[in-house]
Amino acid sequence: MNNLSPPSTVDILEQVYQVIQQRKSAPDPEASYVAKLFHKGDDAILKKVGEEATELVLAIKGRAARNEVAHEAADLIFHTLVGLAIMNIPPTEVMNVLSSRFGKTGLTRNQTPSVELEPSRRQFERRLHSKTIHLIFSSGITIDGLTRDISLDGMQLHVDYADKVRLLGEKGYFELSVQNKATFNANNLLVGLEIPTTMDNNPLMAAVHSARTYRFEFEIVRVTEDAIGLRIIGDKGMFSFALANEVFNDLM
């Protein structure tokens, strides 16, 4: 009797990935389909990934036969692995991220993760704060969320909203007041200020503070039981400027 258990999903993905790694460096582009893709370059590979994703979307949207949808999904997974091979990212690394994202913790960071991950490349840019953000959606919905985690890409918010699933893919905006701080020598000020003289004739310093409100557009890209994840779209440079000015440190 054969007591061997069937290969797991991770095992299958890893085996396919190893074959891709072996074939991608073949000197002859006609040696295999993978070799031909890599000889065409990264752009050709990424274009193919996009094409396969579109075909899967169309198959699902058109309610194609189950085997056809499964076939398109397999094509997309295969070409995604080819894309990962460009950067030598194994599927096990992706599965670890998935385990962390959709495990018991979801977006919550104050619990023990289901899988211990290596530090993210953007971990040094992430900041933990607690600030209320007023979200205004294109659909007209308005929701207040409490920040949990913020990075240059976006933020995670705790929200008390019953139908959060419907928010996935929704776009909108929020506004933040960013304070600019500057220090000027009193002898060089171009504005009229009454500054008392000092006995030691030391230069007087005046701190000038101004604030400006900026609008940031977002898209909801993740939803869990009690939180949403949003991605900043549009001008990320201004959001980076807001972070640099500690806009999330003031408040509650």
UniProtKB/Swiss-Prot annotation:
GO terms for molecular function: ATP binding; phosphoribosyl-ATP diphosphatase activity. GO terms for cellular component: cytoplasm. It holds the Pfam family PRA-PH. Keywords: Amino-acid biosynthesis, ATP-binding, Cytoplasm, Histidine biosynthesis, Hydrolase, Nucleotide-binding. Pathway: Amino-acid biosynthesis; L-histidine biosynthesis; L-histidine from 5-phospho-alpha-D-ribose 1-diphosphate: step 2/9. It is found in: Cytoplasm. It catalyses: 1-(5-phospho-beta-D-ribosyl)-ATP + H2O = 1-(5-phospho-beta-D-ribosyl)-5'-AMP + diphosphate + H(+). Its EC number is 3.6.1.31. InterPro entries: HisE, PRib-ATP_PPHydrolase-like. It comes from the Bacteria. It is an enzyme of class 3 (hydrolase). GO terms for biological process: L-histidine biosynthetic process. CDD domains: NTP-PPase_HisIE_like. Belongs to the PRA-PH family. This is Phosphoribosyl-ATP pyrophosphatase.
